[in-house]
Amino acid sequence: FVAKARTIKVGDPRDPSTVIGPIIRKSHCAFVDAHIQDAVAKGAKLLTGGTHDGPFYQPTVLADVTPAMKVYDEETFAPVTSILRVKDADHALHVANDTSYGLSSSVMTRDIDTALKFAEQLEAGMVHINDCTLHDEPTAPFGGVKNSGFGRENGRCGIDEMTELKWITIQSGRRAFPF
């Protein structure tokens, strides 16, 4: 996982080889830095990343994260992965829901039935099974629960509100009128 994180290209989103674009604003990098420094000061291991060049934050992996750390239950909104050990599936569910936020989550498993049962209990607006936590599809409603938002964007309602319908027809050849 760490080796893969080190290979992820960060940069200009107009470059097709870029995987991670810039943080939303340069000042947010200080916020992310504070989360990482807090975690390391409280015992987390920084396995990779933790640096940025302007608004381009390197993929960061922290291990041995605990509930005492900001990255545990606050939205960092950066390419930061927090790794912590859990005892079993019940403990994993408790940890996943132990936050006042709930935008998106992932369940990784080979057992899809278990994943679906787990997903139903997750307190998140979006749950992705065997995929990353962010997958944007304009036809699907995007939004969180708890303090991660109110309502949804995208989906049918979003498409209806943000588009204009236009009917265009093409008649190839002469139309045969009944008169």
Language-model features: where?
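Diglycine-centered glycine-rich loop/turn motifs
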Residues: 45-50
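Conserved C-terminal structural/oligomerization subdomain of aldehyde/semialdehyde dehydrogenase
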Residues: 6-13, 21-24, 36, 42, ...
